[in-house]
Amino acid sequence: MPKLKTKSGAKKRFKVTGTGKVMSAHAGKRHGMIKRTKKQIRQLRGTRVLFKTDGDNIKQYFLPNA
């Protein structure tokens, strides 16, 4: 049986760390930033670690070879 392919959209959005955690960018930075404070905008920079259950689902269904 052949290996499962990784979903190409997930490949661009998520990164699996060496310890198996799943990292992703913060949501909510595409538009509507005028309503947010400078602190809120600043806190949305960079990446975040997903909750364990969400990360496990991402790895199982979208990143099977990670």
UniProtKB/Swiss-Prot annotation:
InterPro entries: Ribosomal_bL35 (IPR001706), Ribosomal_bL35-like (IPR021137), Ribosomal_bL35_CS (IPR018265), Ribosomal_bL35_sf (IPR037229). Residues 1-15, 27-40 have a biased composition (Basic residues). Transmembrane segments: none annotated. One of its GO terms (cellular component) is cytosolic large ribosomal subunit. Keywords: Ribonucleoprotein, Ribosomal protein. One of its GO terms (molecular function) is structural constituent of ribosome. GO terms for biological process: translation. Gene3D superfamilies: 4.10.410.60. This is Large ribosomal subunit protein bL35.
